[in-house]
A protein has these predicted regions:
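N-terminal Rossmann-fold NAD(P) dinucleotide-binding loop
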Residues: 186
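Flavin (FAD/FMN)-binding glycine-rich loop and adjacent Rossmann-like elements that form
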Residues: 168-169, 212, 271, 280-282, ...
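Extracytoplasmic
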Residues: 28-168, 581-716
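Conserved N-terminal/central alpha/beta ligand/cofactor-binding core
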Residues: 192, 198-199, 204-273, 319, ...
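Beta1/beta-strand and adjacent pyrophosphate-binding region of the FAD-binding site
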Residues: 172-183
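Bacterial N-terminal signal peptides
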Residues: 10-23
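N-terminal secretory signal peptides that target proteins for export/translocation
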Residues: 1-7
Length: 716
C-alpha cells in the first residue's frame, strides 16, 4: 500500500493487490511501505518496529542471495523523481543491495552508509505518469535491510519511519477478551477463554503461533505442562528440530477450530487507547499483509507479548533488570540492582551435504572471537548487559555475526567442506525483558520455600536457571547457567499465585508469559514455556469468569472466587486434592515399600510432570524395581501409569513389566516414547492385596523411567 504523508491531500488512485490493499498518493510524494512489497526471498521483520518505527525487509539468505522483492506503484505525474531508501549498514562487508525504479537500477549501493537507520539518497530518475515497478535486489544474502522507499519531488529527505501511527483505523474488531501475543502462553489464554464461551481476539505478529516454540525460533517447550491444554499446544520436539513445523500446523488447526476466536496473524500491535478511568479500551495494530490499522476493542486484555508492550503502553507498573539482594531477600540476586537480564539466543544448525558447499564470511570472522563451530546451542546467548528492548536489533545482529564468523572459520577445515548452514533464525529467542507488576511479585523464596499459595494457579519444577556470559574469557556470546538447575539443590514442585498474572494498576489487564509479575531471580525457574503456558490457561479461565461474574481480574482474588477458578483449571493445589483422583490409589517411586535394585539413580526431573518430586532412571545393568500395589480388596482394577515428559524417550522405547497377583504373573510393556506426563491406562487386571509390579530394565529397550502408578476400580 502506498500512502501519502499529507492525508488531507490524498486521493484514491487504484487497488494494487488482493486483500483490499490500496494505493494512495499525492502529486509530490509516494511512499512504499516495506510490508507492501511482494517479498520474494526477503523476510518481513516487525520485531523491532516499536523501537525503530516500522517493520523492514531483511535479506536473510544465510549467505545465498535471496530473490528480489517488488512493488507496483502509480506515479501521479511525469517528471524527475528523487528516490530515498530507509536503510542502515549493519556491518562492514555485508548487507548490500540495490534498488531499481521503473526498470532503471539506481547507482547507489545501499546498506554501506551510516550504521543508524536513515534515508539514503538513490539520486533522481525520470518517470512517466502511470504504473512503475520498485525492485530490491540483494547482493550477498547477508541481511541487507530496507524499511521503505519514498519517491518525492522535493530535495529534502523524509523524516522518521513510515510509521503505522500516521494511518487511520481501517477496521474495528470487538471481542470480550483480546490477547496480544501468540506464543504458547497467549495461545493457551485465548483457547481457554474461547472454550468457556466468550469471544476472543488473538493478535499475533508472525504467520504462525508458538512464539519461541515455533519452527521460526525452535526452542523446545520445557517445564511442567500440568494442564491438558498445555499438552495440546506445546512443542513436541527438542531445540532446533525442523519437525517443530508439525507443531505449528497443529496449533493453527486447534485455534482455527475454535469458533469463538478471531485469529489475526501477521498483525503487530503498536499502541493502546484508554478509558477515562485508566483501563484499556482498545489495542491498535498494523495488519502487515494488508497494510492497514486495526483496532481491537474489549473489556479485558492479556499481555502475552513477552516484552510487556501492552502494559507499557497502558501505563502499567513494570521493571527490567536485576533487583538488589536486600529488596526481596534473594540469595542469588546481586548486592546492588542493575539492568542485567537473561540474554537472547539464535540457535543454529548446519547439515552435511553430499558435495562441497561454499560459505565464506571473512568480515564476520573477527566477531567469532576465535570460536569455530558448525552448530550453535542454547548457550549462544547475548545481551545480558544490554537493553533487551531498546537494543534488540543490535543484540540479534551480534549473534548473527558470531554465527557467520564461527561457521566461516569452521569451513576452513577439510572435514567441514560439505557442511551447509541450513538454519539460523532472524527472530530473537528472548528469555527476559520487561516484567509487569501485579499484586504479588514472585521471587526466589517462593521457589525455594515452595510457598503453598492459597491462590495457586500454576506449578513448576524447573530449578532457578540464571545465565552468565562467563563461558570463556574473551568470548561475549557464550554463556553458562547457574542457580538451582543442574548446579546445586533442586526444590521439587513450586507454585505460582494468581496475583502474579494481573496488573496492579491497570484494572482490566492480565499478563501471561515471561512478562508476569516476578523478580529477575524469581523468573529463573518459571520462565520455561510449558510453565508460562499454564499462566495463559489460568488467565483465559479467569477472563471467562470475569465476564460471567461481572468481575475485574483483581476481583477474582479479592472476592473469593479462587476455588472456583482452581476447580475449572483442574488438578491438585496446595491443600486441595484433585477430586478426579478421589478413588485412585497411587504409589510413587518415593513411596514406602518401593524397592530399587542396584543400578538405579534418583533424579529430579526439572522438565516436570512426574508424580512426586523425583523419578528413577536405571543404568545399563540395573536390577528390577518392585512396586507394592495399594490394593485393599480383591477385584477388577485398571492399572494406570504416568511417564514424565523427556527428550530421552525415542521411538521404540519399551519398558517390560511383570504384574504378580494371587500367584498369577502377567507380562506387558509400557511405551515410554509416549512420555507426555499424563496418566495412561496400562490395562485391566484382577488384583488382590499383596499384588506387586516389577520393572525389568535388563529386558527393556531404550529409555526407561520409574515414576508413579495407580490402581483404580474398573469402570470408574
Amino acid at each position: 500500500m502506498l500512502v501519502a504523508r499529507d492525508l488531507l491531500k490524498a486521493v484514491l488512485c487504484a487497488a494494487v493487490a488482493a486483500g483490499m490493499m490500496l494505493q494512495v498518493c499525492t502529486a509530490a510524494r509516494v511512499e512504499v511501505y516495506p510490508q507492501c512489497f511482494e517479498p520474494g526471498g526477503w523476510s518481513l521483520d516487525p520485531q523491532f518496529m516499536d523501537v525503530m518505527g516500522s517493520p523492514y525487509l531483511l535479506a536473510h539468505g544465510l549467505g545465498v542471495r535471496v530473490m528480489d522483492a517488488t512493488a507496483r506503484v502509480d506515479v501521479p505525474e511525469s517528471g524527475e523523481w528523487r528516490v530515498w531508501v530507509r536503510t542502515r549498514k549493519w556491518v562492514d562487508g555485508a548487507g548490500a543491495f540495490r534498488v531499481s525504479v521503473g526498470g532503471r537500477t539506481l547507482p547507489t549501493v545501499f546498506g554501506r552508509g551510516a550504521p543508524e537507520w536513515n534515508w539514503e539518497s538513490g539520486g533522481a530518475v525520470r518517470l512517466e505518469k502511470g504504473e512503475v515497478e520498485v525492485r530490491l535486489t540483494d547482493l550477498d544474502g547477508f541481511d541487507g535491510r530496507c524499511a521503505g522507499v519514498v519517491l518525492t519531488q522535493e530535495a529534502t529527505p523524509p523524516k522518521g519511519a513510515l510509521s503505522p501511527e500516521a494511518q487511520p483505523v481501517a477496521e474495528t474488531v470487538r471481542a470480550d477478551f483480546v490477547v496480544v501475543g501468540g506464543g504458547l502462553p497467549g495461545t493457551c489464554a485465548a483457547v481457554a477463554a474461547a472454550r468457556r464461551g466468550i469471544k476472543v481476539a488473538l493478535v499475533q505478529d508472525r504467520p504462525m503461533l508458538g512464539g519461541n516454540a515455533s519452527s521460526e525460533i525452535r526452542v523446545w517447550s520445557g517445564g511442567e505442562t500440568r494442564y491438558d491444554l498445555v499438552r495440546e499446544l506445546r512443542g513436541r520436539f527438542t531445540n532446533s528440530d525442523a519437525n517443530l513445523a508439525l507443531c505449528d500446523a497443529r496449533r493453527m488447526r486447534i485455534v482455527a477450530d475454535e469458533t469463538n476466536i478471531a485469529l489475526r496473524v501477521n498483525t503487530r500491535a503498536f499502541g493502546v487507547e484508554k478509558n477515562a478511568d485508566g483501563t484499556i479500551a482498545s489495542v491498535k495494530a498494523l495488519d502487515l499483509k494488508r497494510n492497514r490499522v486495526v483496532r481491537f476493542e474489549a473489556h479485558l486484555f492479556c499481555d502475552a507479548t513477552g516484552d510487556g508492550w501492552v502494559g507499557y503502553w497502558a501505563g502499567a507498573d513494570w521493571r527490567m533488570g536485576r533487583e538488589a539482594k536486600s529488596e526481596y531477600g534473594e540469595s542469588l540476586a546481586p548486592e546492588k540492582a542493575d539492568g542485567d537480564t537473561l540474554g537472547a539466543s539464535l540457535m543454529w544448525t548446519s547439515v552435511v551435504a553430499n558435495a562441497p558447499v561454499e560459505f565464506s564470511a571473512p568480515w564476520a570472522e573477527p566477531h567469532a572471537q576465535g570460536v569455530e563451530a558448525v552448530n550453535g546451542w542454547w548457550n549462544w546467548e547475548y545481551g545480558i548487559h544490554r537493553d533487551m528492548i531498546a537494543e534488540g536489533e543490535a543484540i540479534r545482529d551480534r549473534l548473527l555475526l558470531a554465527t557467520y564468523g564461527a561457521f566461516s572459520l569452521a569451513k576452513r577445515r577439510p572435514e567441514n567442506t560439505n557442511n551447509a548452514l541450513n538454519l539460523c533464525p532472524f527472530l530473537l529467542g528472548k528469555r527476559e525483558s520487561r516484567r509487569l507488576l501485579g499484586d504479588w511479585v514472585y521471587s526466589e523464596k517462593d521457589v525455594t520455600s515452595r510457598r503453598p499459595f492459597a491462590d495457586a494457579i500454576a506449578s513448576g519444577s524447573w530449578g532457578i536457571d540464571l545465565h552468565f556470559d562467563n563461558y570463556r574469557p574473551g568470548v561475549d556470546f557464550l554463556t553458562t547457567c547457574h542457580g538451582t538447575t543442574d548446579h546445586g539443590e533442586t526444590y521439587g514442585r513450586y507454585w505460582i499465585p494468581y496475583r502474579s498474572i494481573y496488573s496492579r494498576n491497570v484494572a482490566n489487564l492480565f499478563m501471561a508469559g515471561r512478562c508476569f509479575s516476578c523478580t529477575h531471580v524469581g523468573l529463573g525457574g518459571p520462565r520455561v514455556m510449558n510453565t508460562l503456558a499454564q499462566l495463559g490457561v489460568a488467565a483465559g479461565e479467569a477472563a471467562a469468569m470475569c465476564r460471567e461474574l461481572g468481575e475485574t481480574p483483581r476481583g477474582i482474588y479479592a472476592h473469593d472466587h479462587i476455588r472456583m477458578l482452581q476447580g475449572r483449571l483442574g488438578g491438585e493445589f496446595p491443600g486441595v486434592p484433585d477430586p478426579k483422583l478421589a478413588d485412585w490409589r497411587i504409589v510413587d517411586d518415593e513411596s514406602a515399600g518401593v524397592k530399587f535394585g542396584n543400578g538405579w539413580h534418583k533424579r529430579h526431573v526439572h522438565y516436570g510432570d512426574q508424580v512426586g518430586e523425583y523419578a528413577h532412571f536405571p543404568g545399563k545393568k540395573a536390577e528390577p524395581a518392585v512396586y507394592p500395589l495399594p490394593v485393599e480388596k480383591a477385584g477388577r482394577y485398571a492399572l494406570m501409569g504416568r511417564v514424565p515428559y523427556s527428550w530421552g524417550a525415542k521411538p521404540g522405547s519399551r519398558t517390560v513389566c511383570e504384574l504378580t497377583s494371587g500367584g498369577r504373573v502377567e507380562t506387558f510393556t509400557i511405551d515410554q516414547a509416549i512420555a507426555d506426563g499424563t496418566w495412561r491406562k496400562l490395562g485391566e487386571f484382577d488384583l488382590a492385596p499383596g499384588a506387586t509390579l516389577k520393572l525389568l530394565p535388563a529386558k527393556s529397550k531404550g529409555y526407561v523411567v520409574a515414576d508413579g502408578f495407580a490402581v483404580v476400580p474398573a469402570g470408574i
